[in-house]
Every structure is written in C-alpha cells, then in structure tokens.
C-alpha cells in the first residue's frame, strides 16, 4: 500500500496499490505524478529460467489513476499451433529486466525517457519517449547491442551515449552536442574503468567516480578529463546525487556517517547545521522541494530509529512526519570506533551497547561482520544489533579489510 501525504497538514492525499510488484523506489516526477518502481520474479517461455522483471508505474494524484510505463507484458498469440508472444509495446524485447529506469523528464510534454532493449533476435539498447498520461511509448533514439547508457537534456535532446562490448572489450563514449555523433573516449578493458553517472547543470560535462574516492568530469566537446573535483580523506564517494534528468545536485560521502558537498555554500551550511544538531546519528538528505526551501531528511542512529523529518529552511523548523520503527522506546548506544589490527592497520567499526549504562560492564561480545565484502556498516538503527544488545550482549560490527566506505587503502587491503 502506497500513501501520499500532505507534508504540511499530514493529511492523506491518496492511497493505492501497485499489484503484486515489490516496491524498489518511489519519487515525484511532477507535483501530481508519483513514480513507483517495482519488480517481481517471473519466467517466460521464450527465456530460460526466471528473472526479476521490473516496471515503472505512474500514479496521478488528481485522477487517482495508476498507469504502467513502457509495458513489456506478454500478449500471447496462437498461430498454427505455435505459441507466440508479442510485447504490449511494439518492438520491445520481452525478456529483460531494468525497465523501471527513467533517465529524463520533459515537463512541457509530460513525457519521461526510458531506456530499453528493442528487437527479438539481436536486441539493442534504445530510448523510448513515454507519456505520463497514457503510458504509451514511442522509440525516440536508437542504440546498438553494445549501448549501455544514454544522457539527455531537459527537452529530450540526446547529449551522449555510452557503449561497451564484452566481445571486443571496447569502452566508448560518444557526444552529440554538435548535432552529430563524435567519439570522445575510447579504451580497451575487460570491464569499464568508470561509467558516467551524472551531467552538469549546463549540459557540457559528464561526471564519474574513480575507485569511489574522487569525482572527475569529462568535457562533452573534447572528451578532456578534469579532476579530482570532489573528495574527502578517508571516505568514499558514496553517491552522486542527481535530479530526474541526471543533473548533478550534490556529492554524498560514505564513512561512519554521511557528509555532503553542495555547489551552493548556503546548502552546505544547512547540512552542517543538521549534522551538528544530530551529532550521534546519520543524517541523509532524501529530497528537496522545487524552491529548495524544504528538505526531506532521514535521521537514523542514536537520535532515532529511522525518523523522517521535513526541514523548513526559512522558518528553521523541523517537523517529524513518520518513523521506520515507531514503537521503539529506547535505543542502545551506537558508537563509532577505530581499533588497530596486528599489522597496525586502522579498522573502523560500530560498537552497540545496551540502553542501560549500568549493564555495560563485562559483557559477552558478538562479532557481526557485514556481507559483501564490498560493503560497510554505518551509524544507524540496526534492528539485529539492537535486539542482541537488548539480550545483554555488546555487538561489534567491524569494517574489515576490503570494506568500502572508508577510502581506497582499507578497500585495497582486502585484495591480498
């Protein structure tokens, strides 16, 4: 069940279901269009085995109508006792995942741009223009079997295309800012050394990360690479934050708690105020209003079990709207610590202790390493760690060699 709530009055504006699909992401495309990305495990007689079939849905708050975007559902046909299937969207390859991805929004035409594989025998990765009103799609740009990504501007003009061939090992980036396709980057490798993740506000540069440590840019006219532009010592670049058109809005760093780099200094000051107000927790900026006055933030750690709050920057006021775990009465203390391995390498770790300080002496300890191994534990409300501390244990979550989040040295030390 999805609920759309007015942040000011906390009144429910709409509620709806997206069928049997598992929700993966939810966000606003416009003030009245909510995008829901979901998936479910399916099988298809033309495809061996099962795969996670994903879709994007749009919910119109005014009409209260839920519409599927770029539908690859199978329409079965029988002809001469031969079972045939055709996708509901003409020429769309039926057995593919990742169909919920949106890479652009045209506000004037109320259309979104979605990449997908077309063709049955030799599928190629194209871009479709999809109506938010009807969900109907038309092929907008044609790629090839090696195409893996696209970049467009706000009106749908194609700016760049990324190709990678597993057969030849060629990694290619093409620019179309001049009106014609021009090759601006070429490299041969078993896997791409990087992949562009965002585009600049002026549509002139692509941004990418190197070993998750620093952010670099590539000029779309010449292919010149500049950087490092952003980076913090002892932290990975966790995420390049973008809008729906993949324009870079900020850089989020990892570590024990997140930190951000915004292009606007006032935004940096706002986040600094939030992080200082919740010094023992992780503060994530989940979204911002169009005028940038209201921020939706997620606080998790010693100050809350996953609380969502809205910051009114003009009034300097925080309003709680909901919590992930509303019935949690008390939280065991979460400490960010460092200890030395036998060879002197500093290992960052999370130590969680019982809520009662009187019960923190001579505790048995449980080591709870994360999965991955390319992952890391942070200051957050971890239900399993909290459960174990409530039973009288101390819980240590080490970010061992090979863990991400704390810079290249720690991650590289796990390679042996």
Go through the PLM ranges and name each one.
Residues 3, 12, 294, 309, ...:
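Generic alpha-helical hydrophobic packing signal
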Residues 303-338:
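An N-terminal hydrophobic leader/cap segment in hydrolases
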Residues 68-69, 321, 361-362:
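Short, charged, solvent-exposed linker or helix-capping segments at domain edges/interfaces
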Residues 1-294, 302-304, 314:
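Beta-propeller folds
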Residues 39, 300, 352-354:
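Residue-level recognition of strand-loop junctions within catalytic nucleotide-signaling folds
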Residues 274-275, 300-301, 393, 414:
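Alpha-helix boundary/capping detector
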Residues 327-416:
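Cap/lid segment of the alpha/beta-hydrolase catalytic domain
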Residues 103, 316-319, 361:
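Intrinsic-disorder/low-complexity peptide segments enriched for small residues
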């Amino acid at each position: 069940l999805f609920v759309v709530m007015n942040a000011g009055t906390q009144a429910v504006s709409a509620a709806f279901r997206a069928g049997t699909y598992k929700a993966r992401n939810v966000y606003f495309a416009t003030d009245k269009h909510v995008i829901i990305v979901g998936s479910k495990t399916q099988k298809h007689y033309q495809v061996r085995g099962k795969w996670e079939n994903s879709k994007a849905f749009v919910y119109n708050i005014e009409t209260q109508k839920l519409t599927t975007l770029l539908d690859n559902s199978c329409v079965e046909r029988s002809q001469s006792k031969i079972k045939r299937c055709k996708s509901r969207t003409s020429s769309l390859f039926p057995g593919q995942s990742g169909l919920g991805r949106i890479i652009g929004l045209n506000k004037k035409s109320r259309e979104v741009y979605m990449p997908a594989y077309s063709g049955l025998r030799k599928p190629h990765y194209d871009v479709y223009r999809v109506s938010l009103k009807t969900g109907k799609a038309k092929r907008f740009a044609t790629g090839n079997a090696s195409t893996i990504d696209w970049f467009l501007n706000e009106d749908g003009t194609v700016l760049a295309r990324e190709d990678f061939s597993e057969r030849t090992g060629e990694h290619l980036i093409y620019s179309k800012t001049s009106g014609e396709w021009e090759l601006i980057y070429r490299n041969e490798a078993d896997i791409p050394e990087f992949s562009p993740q965002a585009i600049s506000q002026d549509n002139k540069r692509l941004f990418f990360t190197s070993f998750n440590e620093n952010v670099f840019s590539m000029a779309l006219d010449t292919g010149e690479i500049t950087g490092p532009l952003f980076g913090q010592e002892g932290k990975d670049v966790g995420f390049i934050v973008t809008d729906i058109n993949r324009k870079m809005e900020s850089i989020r760093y990892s570590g024990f708690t997140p930190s951000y780099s915004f292009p606007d200094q006032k935004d940096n000051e706002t986040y600094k105020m939030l992080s200082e107000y919740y010094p023992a927790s992780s503060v994530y900026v989940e979204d911002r209003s169009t005028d940038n006055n209201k921020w939706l933030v997620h606080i998790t750690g010693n100050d809350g079990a996953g609380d969502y709050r809205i910051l009114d920057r003009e009034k300097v006021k925080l309003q709680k709207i909901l919590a992930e775990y509303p019935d949690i009465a008390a939280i065991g203390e979460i400490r960010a610590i460092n200890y030395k391995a036998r060879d002197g390498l500093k290992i960052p770790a999370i130590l969680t202790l019982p809520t009662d300080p009187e019960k923190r002496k001579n505790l048995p300890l449980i080591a709870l390493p994360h999965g991955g191994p390319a992952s890391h534990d942070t200051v957050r409300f971890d239900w399993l760690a909290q459960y174990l501390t409530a039973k009288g244990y101390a819980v240590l979550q080490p970010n061992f060699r090979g863990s991400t989040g704390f810079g290249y040295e720690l991650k590289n030390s796990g390679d042996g």
